[in-house]
Amino acid sequence: MLRAKMLGRGPYKPLAILRHMGPLCATRPQHWRFQHSYAEKHSNCARHPLWTGPVSSPGGTQQSPINIQWTDSVYDPKLAPLRVSYDAASCRYLWNTGYFFQVEFDDSCEESGISGGPLGNHYRLKQFHFHWGATDEWGSEHMVDGHAYPAELHLVHWNSMKYENYKKATTGENGLAVIGVFLKLGAHHEALQRLVDILPEVRHKDTQVTMGPFDPSCLLPACRDYWTYPGSLTTPPLAESVTWIVHKMPIEVSPSQLSTFRTLLFSGRGEDEEVMVNNFRPLQPLRGRNVRSSFQVPRVGTKS
C-alpha cells in the first residue's frame, strides 16, 4: 500500500530482471511544434534549490541541453542498440525534490542498468525524473531542429565499473549516462498512469511515497533509434560527466496526464504555493561537439 511521508527509503524487495526490445522505427516523427523564444522567455536558472551559479557552468564547453539538428547529426554505424535491463523490484520511492518529481532506485547492485550503444561500461540506474512546461507548447530540455516537446523524461545512470558510487561518478569522466525521452500529447499512457495516480501524495516539496515494483523500460519508446553526444547535467553541479542518449521517437501521454504534473509545487508545506512548471534549463551552445546518430538520416529531397 502506498503511503506519503517525509524523506526516507522504502523496504527492499527481491530481484526480477526484465528485458525489452523495440520494433522498427518510422523515419521521422510527425508531430513537431515550434516555439520561437523557448529559451529566452522561459529561462529558469534560479529555480533549482541548489542553483547559486550562472546559467552556464563557468568555462564549461560541453553543457546541456542542446538543440539537436537532425541533418547535422552524424550516422555512426558502430553504435549498437542500447542494452536495457531494469529490475522492477529495485524501485524504492517517488518524491518531490522541489524542482521535479523523481523516482529513486536501489543502485547497490548491477541488476538494474544499461550497457552497449555508445557506452564502454555497465551503468547502474539511479533515478528518473521529468521536465515540463507551463503549457503544452514547451517543456522539454532538448530540442530537435528548434522544436520543443511538452515534456522530457531523464533516466540517470552511473558508471559502476569505474566509480564506487553515484556521488563520485557525478563529477568523474564518463561518470554518468542519461537517457532522454520526449513526451508528446496523444493517447493515454497506461504505465505512466501508475505515477500520475500518486502525484497528489507528493504535491509539496520534500514529500515522498513508497513504491512497489516498477520497471521504467515501460516508459521507453518502441523505436530504439537515438542520438548521442557528450554533455552535462542540466541541474547543479552542471558537471560535464554525461553521455547523453536521446531517443529519436517520443512516447505519447494524454493531456490530462501531463496536466497532473502541473499540480505539483516547488514550495513546501506552510510556504506560499508556487506551481511547479517550466522546470527546464535553457539551451546551451554546441561548441563544436559532434552529435552522433544510431540511424541513417535521409538526405534532403529523398523519400523516407
From Swiss-Prot:
Key words of the record: Lyase, Metal-binding, Mitochondrion, Transit peptide, Zinc
Family membership: Belongs to the alpha-carbonic anhydrase family.
Protein name: Carbonic anhydrase 5A, mitochondrial
Transit peptide start and end: 1-34
Domain Alpha-carbonic anhydrase per the UniProt entry, residue ranges: 35-295
Source organism: Rattus norvegicus
Gene of this entry: Ca5a
Key word Zinc present: yes
Enzyme class at the top of the EC tree: lyase
